[in-house]
């Protein structure tokens, strides 16, 4: 996701005719609170983006002070006022639509909206408060088209919009994204989903320290920062990437496969498949810039196309799981939570250890009846250990 922010909106991939796509991703990471979504993002390039943008802020502060002195001198000498320096911005926390337009109009490569909670991003853009044109404007951000916004005081023009969006969401709140309203106008379908899975057993203190040392001085971190740095250096340079014929055939055939899959699905999932068809080429463009040594001068090759299909299969599986979660009734949701909790506890735990954390999700009698059904259907194995009742995954 951080690569989507770094690459900016001046890079496009040519599919056919005048159909082009940018590497703009909208990502919702699904996982319970406290799972470590933010630290993971920081380790996967977020810290580097923050460091880079902080450097830009320092440069802007210095340039602004110099500009203020120049303005003062110009007034004294009755000269034209010098041009105000531009504050370079690559990403922002949840902001209003008005602020987004103001920043984007000064940063033509676009800016990402990154937050711990994806709902706060949408609420900041008045997604749930605004009606009519406000909602349509939010939807149009995903399309990466131009934005002409006349106001009482001025008219801001953004020739080419680029606003990647990323944030986390708890599984219980998924219905706020995949709602009937969001399904009708395509808001839900615009999101890629990523389910975060917790390891059954926490790492030991020794292993935790070892991992920290590996990350701080690893060659992987150096390569990651070097790659993101390359993208940032290239982000202000417009370029259109074409595909080698073999790569083009692979991706277009995969797009055809998604069309067929979509037609066999319900209306909500059909809309998701339609957006995933465009995401094929957005992801391909992003991978091209990540792996190609000279991405601005090279065609997208067959190897990148195959990598793209692998990544897209991951997102398709996560989409199916996300939409499947919405279709679960309350009993099915509690059953999933019981199974997930047993898995989190290492695949084997006492009934009490599973039941206690889920007391807000199900009453005692409801929990017991669903647990009994899971045991009867073979989803869980129940054994007695003295007075304690143990349950485990098969």
Region spans (language model):
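Phosphate-handling catalytic cores of nucleic-acid transaction enzymes
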Residues: 1-394
């Amino acid at each position: 996701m951080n690569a989507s922010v770094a690459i900016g909106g001046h890079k496009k991939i040519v599919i056919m005719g005048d159909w082009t796509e940018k590497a703009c991703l909208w990502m919702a990471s699904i996982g319970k609170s406290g799972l470590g979504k933010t630290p993971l993002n920081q380790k996967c390039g977020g810290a580097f983006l923050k460091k880079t943008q902080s450097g830009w802020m320092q440069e802007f502060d210095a340039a602004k002070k110099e500009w203020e002195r120049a303005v003062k001198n110009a007034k004294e000498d009755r000269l034209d006022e010098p041009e105000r320096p531009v504050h370079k911005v690559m990403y922002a926390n949840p902001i209003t639509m008005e602020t987004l337009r103001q920043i984007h109009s000064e940063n033509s490569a676009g800016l990402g909206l990154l937050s711990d909670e994806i709902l706060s991003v949408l609420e900041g853009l008045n997604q749930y408060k605004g009606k009519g044109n406000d909602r349509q404007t939010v939807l149009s951000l995903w399309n990466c088209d131009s934005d002409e916004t006349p106001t009482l005081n001025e008219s801001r023009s953004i020739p080419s919009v680029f606003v990647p969006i990323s944030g986390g969401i708890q599984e219980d709140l998924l219905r706020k994204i995949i709602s009937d309203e969001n399904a009708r106008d395509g808001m839900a379908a615009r999101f890629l989903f990523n389910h975060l899975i917790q390891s059954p057993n926490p790492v030991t203190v020794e292993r935790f320290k070892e991992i920290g040392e590996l990350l701080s001085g690893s060659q992987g971190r150096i390569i990651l920062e070097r790659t993101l740095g390359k993208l940032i250096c290239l982000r202000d340079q417009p370029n259109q990437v074409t595909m080698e014929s073999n790569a083009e055939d692979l991706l277009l055939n995969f797009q055809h496969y998604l069309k067929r899959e979509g037609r066999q699905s319900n209306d909500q999932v059909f809309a998701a498949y339609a957006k995933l068809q465009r995401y094929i080429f957005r992801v391909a463009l992003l991978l091209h810039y990540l792996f190609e040594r000279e991405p601005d001068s090279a065609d997208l090759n067959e190897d990148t196309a195959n990598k793209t299909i692998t990544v897209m299969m991951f997102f398709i599986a996560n989409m199916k799981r996300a939409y499947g979660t919405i279709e679960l009734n309350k009993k099915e949701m509690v059953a999933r939570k019981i199974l997930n909790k047993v898995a989190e506890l290492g695949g084997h735990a006492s009934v009490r250890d599973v039941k206690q954390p889920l007391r807000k999700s199900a009453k005692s009698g409801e929990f017991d009846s669903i647990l009994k059904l899971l045991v009867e259907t073979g989803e869980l194995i129940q054994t007695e250990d003295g007075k304690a009742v143990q349950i485990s995954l098969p």
